[in-house]
Amino acid sequence: MQVERVDFVSFLTQDLARARRFYTEVLGLEIETEGESDLELRAGQVTLDVFDPSSIGQPFAPSPAGVALRVADVDAARAELESKGVPFDGDTIVTGVCKQAWFKDPDGNALMLHRRFDV
């Protein structure tokens, strides 16, 4: 088997309308497709799928794993999101390879603003 690429990353939501507002109005992502129980958004070359698990009788649980959203300037992007009322989980982290700032969507799914130093 050879994996060609990641087609999408999925998050669960308890409120699709609220998730739509957050991902489009706050993060500025564009909707690719939208159904009754899910929403697919374009994030660069990856699709984020936001899905209401209650539509298939499954329980909700936020994802603590996190998705790194690459931005040109982590500090500027963080300031922009903070001005829109998005709280961050601690200070911006600088490692040997990147800068990152962690936050959550309204359902508690972990996200980070991210930039590698070599890119």
Identify the meaning behind each predicted range.
Residues E30-P62, A110-R116:
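Conserved short beta-strand elements that form part of the metal-binding/catalytic scaffold
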Residues M1-A17, T47, A65-L69, F117-V119:
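N-terminal beta-strand motif that seeds the catalytic metal site of vicinal oxygen chelate
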Residues D15-E30:
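Amphipathic alpha-helical segments
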Residues E36-D38, G66, C98-Q100:
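Short hydrophobic/aromatic beta-strand or adjacent loop that forms the aromatic wall/cage
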Residues M1-Q2, R78, E82-V119:
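Vicinal oxygen chelate
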Residues G28-T33, F88-T92:
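Short secondary-structure junctions
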Residues F22, D75-E80:
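Short amphipathic alpha-helices within nucleic acid-binding modules
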